[in-house]
Curated annotation (Swiss-Prot):
One of its GO terms (molecular function) is SNAP receptor activity. It comes from Arabidopsis thaliana. This is Membrin-11. Residues 222-225 are vesicular. It is found in: Golgi apparatus membrane. GO terms for cellular component: Golgi membrane. Residues 2-200 are cytoplasmic.
């Protein structure tokens, strides 16, 4: 009986020592992962290694649970039961810590992806806005050019009408002088009426030219808008 207890206890001791050694390694891995997290670093290989260690400890804990039940002495059996439970609890605690770390890491990766997507969309929208601004700038430039052309055309029209008015005044003065000369030399009334008719025709031509100029300016304004 004693030999059985020693053999059982020895077997449990070996398994327990292996479990404690792997737990220590897993705990150190968790601490390293948390340090990496605080420095914004990631180590997927280390996380996978810690996960494998915890799985191995769970397997050893299952073996320990079978072994302590075979110990005939109650006091020894209770002792190894508590040790087995402690190993299992520590393995579960480390597994929970690892899951929390992986959850935080996954959330950070998702947030980083969302930020990248937002920046990408913002960049695309920015380019679209710049394109709109360019089109608006081109439209404003076209309006300014049209306005300048209209002002130049209006100024040219005014200058032409002014010159035409000056010519009309000079023509009237010349006509009056010619009539005076004709009256002096005694031309017939038919000749005088012919001259007056020509004056009326010139007056109609003058007003027709003014109206045509105004119509052209109006049509140009409508075309440029």
């Amino acid at each position: 009986m004693a030999s059985g207890i020693v053999e059982g206890g020895g077997s449990l001791s070996d398994v327990y020592s292996s479990a404690k050694r792997i737990l220590l390694k897993a705990r150190d891995g968790i601490e390293r992962l948390e340090r990496f997290e605080s420095s914004s670093m990631d180590s997927p290989d280390l996380a996978s290694s810690v996960k494998r260690d915890i799985t191995e400890v769970r397997s050893l804990c299952s073996n320990m649970d079978t072994l302590w039940r075979s110990i005939p002495v109650k006091s020894q059996r209770d002792l190894w039961r508590r040790k087995t439970e402690q190993v299992g609890e520590e393995a579960e605690y480390l597994n929970l810590s690892l899951e929390k770390y992986m959850s935080r890491n996954q959330r950070k990766m998702l947030e980083a992806k969302e930020r990248a997507d937002l920046l990408g969309r913002a960049s695309g929208e920015g380019a679209h806005i710049l394109q709109i601004f360019d089109e608006e700038a081109q439209a404003m430039s076209s309006v300014k050019n049209s306005k300048r052309m209209l002002e130049e055309s209006f100024s040219s029209g005014v200058a032409i009408l002014s010159k035409y008015a000056e010519q009309r005044d000079r023509l009237k003065s010349a006509q009056r002088k010619a009539l005076d000369v004709l009256n002096t030399v005694g031309l017939s009334n038919s000749v005088l009426r012919l001259i007056e008719r020509r004056n009326r025709v010139d007056t109609w031509i003058k007003y027709a030219g003014m109206i045509a100029t105004l119509v052209i300016l109006y049509l140009f304004i409508r075309w440029t808008r």
